UniProtKB/Swiss-Prot annotation:
Belongs to the cytochrome c family. This is Cytochrome c2 iso-1. One of its GO terms (molecular function) is electron transfer activity. Keywords: Electron transport, Heme, Iron, Metal-binding, Photosynthesis, Transport. It comes from Magnetospirillum fulvum. GO terms for biological process: photosynthesis. Pfam families: Cytochrom_C.
């Protein structure tokens, strides 16, 4: 699937290539796994302690407001969230296809 335009904001820090971390972890295969499992990426203590699974419910909240969803995480410090619900939905649907 082609990435939605809203994913351009994600690409500033995240790769979709397995094992290729940037400022943020690779998003390859992220959908459906527990937070904090991308190999060779140093997660914040907040992310590791969250115990969350990266699924539709989590991403709906997290992509709109990362700071409130996982207080103290790195992403929330620099990214305020996607403002349009349709952008959040488009990015979630795209992440479901990124293996």
């Amino acid at each position: 699937a082609d990435a939605p335009t809203a994913f351009n904001q994600c690409k500033a820090c995240h790769s979709i290539e397995a094992g290729k971390n940037g400022v943020g972890p690779s998003l390859s295969g992220a959908y459906g796994r527990k937070v904090g499992l991308a190999p060779n990426y140093k997660y914040s203590a907040a992310h590791l302690a969250s115990g969350m699974t990266i699924d539709e419910a989590m991403l709906t909240n997290y992509l709109a407001n990362p700071k409130a969803t996982i207080p103290g995480n790195k992403m929330g410090a620099s990214f305020g969230g996607l403002k349009k619900p349709e952008d959040v939905k488009a990015v979630i649907e795209y992440l479901k296809t990124v293996k």
